[in-house]
Amino acid sequence: MKILRKNHPLLKIVNHSFIDLPTPSNISSWWNFGSLLGVCLIIQILTGLFLAMHYTSDTTTAFSSVAHICRDVNYGWLIRYLHANGASMFFICLFIHVGRGIYYGSYVLSETWNIGIILFLTTMATAFVGYVLPWGQMSFWGATVITNLLSAVPYIGSTLVEWIWGGFSVDKATLTRFFAFHFILPFIITAFALVHLLFLHETGSNNPSGLNSDSDKIPFHPYYTIKDLLGIFLLLMALMILALFFPDVLGDPDNFTPANPLNTPAHIKPEWYFLFAYAILRSIPNKLGGVLALILSILILAAFPLLNTSKQHGLIFRPVTQAIYWTFIANLLVLTWIGGQPVEYPFTTIGQIASITYFTIIIILMPVSNTIENNIIKL
């Protein structure tokens, strides 16, 4: 068997990626989230496949087909709630994975980091089009508001919106194409994830100390396979608790009402994992400015390798930047809270302050703290 996995053309790839892969001996549990994201992706594809067998992407039957899945299909309610809450678990793992990358300076592996940003954007697109499919009130109005943002594009905005809608409003054509996108995008994510792994294994993994670990590596199996299995078990346990005991806690009550173009909900908001970006969008009074800020809130991640001037790798020995990093995390939580609040005082003011702080920390404070710490080392 050992000879086979080392010489077989296909098994050799698996062997070099998951069995004999030289891995730093000191990587902590924060490195588990990559494998957890892979598990989340598999769960989402499998549950989504079974949901797609019973779902109909027609405006007249979409809402009732989801109700039919929950009521009449064997374990349909479980599949539906695993899929809906699986998306939340996916984004929790994703945010922690990106946060770990920033904290431990993994962004210096620029190819892996940039593919990761593409993966992040693709996952957000998949979640957005998926949220439209149940065709509830928040699905419909969320789709209307977010797609309508494209009308801010100069000259071609209105044409672009109608082209995406497939008509003059969010309707049957929009739902059908969003279902098609939601079906194909996870497979594109899978392809990008493999490229992400390919680039990671070219350079080798980063580690908590930020030092070169070539002299101290161990095989991935059995050490990290066992460690990953523990993480997977905890993830599945959290997902099952969420899906079985609190299935609707992260959803919106408005989505229990079928979509009605004549009745606007009091407060339109996306799923919780988009609220930080939504708060940044709303904090700018100008429509085009808001859209640009929304896009930049994610694309600014690409600036980390460019703005990094530190002589040390990661934040483990850098107390000044550590304080700024945790302020950044707290600020993100504030943005998430504000995104779910109505557009009125004092929430608008808090949102504007938090949005300015978000960009200031990344563009100004972190590079300045890098310079300060570099000078402290020289003393």
UniProtKB/Swiss-Prot annotation:
Q: Which GO terms describe its biological process?
A: mitochondrial electron transport, ubiquinol to cytochrome c
Q: Per UniProt, where does a ubiquinone bind? A: 201
Among PANTHER family, the record links this protein to: CYTOCHROME B (PTHR19271:SF16)
One GO term describing the cellular component: respiratory chain complex III
Membrane topology term reads: Multi-pass membrane protein
Co-factor note (free text):
Binds 2 heme b groups non-covalently.
Q: Which cofactor does it need?
A: heme b
The UniProt family comment states: Belongs to the cytochrome b family.
User: Could you tell me what this protein is called?
Assistant: Cytochrome b
| UniProt keyword RNA-binding present | no
Any further remark recorded for this protein: Heme 1 (or BL or b562) is low-potential and absorbs at about 562 nm, and heme 2 (or BH or b566) is high-potential and absorbs at about 566 nm.
Task: Recite the lineage of the species.
Answer: Eukaryota, Metazoa, Chordata, Craniata, Vertebrata
Domain of life assignment = Eukaryota
Residue ranges crossing the lipid bilayer per the database entry: 33-53, 77-98, 113-133, 178-198, 226-246, 288-308, 320-340, 347-367
Q: Where does heme b b562 bind?
A: 83, 182
* Described purpose of this protein according to its UniProt entry: Component of the ubiquinol-cytochrome c reductase complex (complex III or cytochrome b-c1 complex) that is part of the mitochondrial respiratory chain. The b-c1 complex mediates electron transfer from ubiquinol to cytochrome c. Contributes to the generation of a proton gradient across the mitochondrial membrane that is then used for ATP synthesis.
Q: Molecular function (GO) terms listed?
A: metal ion binding; ubiquinol-cytochrome-c reductase activity
Coarse class of the protein's main subcellular location? mitochondrion
The record's listing under InterPro entries reads: Cyt_b/b6_C (IPR005798), Cyt_b/b6_C_sf (IPR036150), Cyt_b/b6_N (IPR005797), Cytb/b6-like_sf (IPR027387), Cytochrome_b (IPR030689), Cytochrome_b_C_euk/bac (IPR048260), Cytochrome_b_N_euk/bac (IPR048259), Di-haem_cyt_TM (IPR016174)
**What are the binding positions for heme b b566 in this chain?**
97, 196
The subunit field of the Swiss-Prot or TrEMBL record says: The cytochrome bc1 complex contains 11 subunits: 3 respiratory subunits (MT-CYB, CYC1 and UQCRFS1), 2 core proteins (UQCRC1 and UQCRC2) and 6 low-molecular weight proteins (UQCRH/QCR6, UQCRB/QCR7, UQCRQ/QCR8, UQCR10/QCR9, UQCR11/QCR10 and a cleavage product of UQCRFS1). This cytochrome bc1 complex then forms a dimer.
Alphabetical UniProt keywords? Electron transport, Heme, Iron, Membrane, Metal-binding, Mitochondrion, Mitochondrion inner membrane, Respiratory chain, Transmembrane, Transmembrane helix, Transport, Ubiquinone
Cited PROSITE patterns: CYTB_CTER, CYTB_NTER
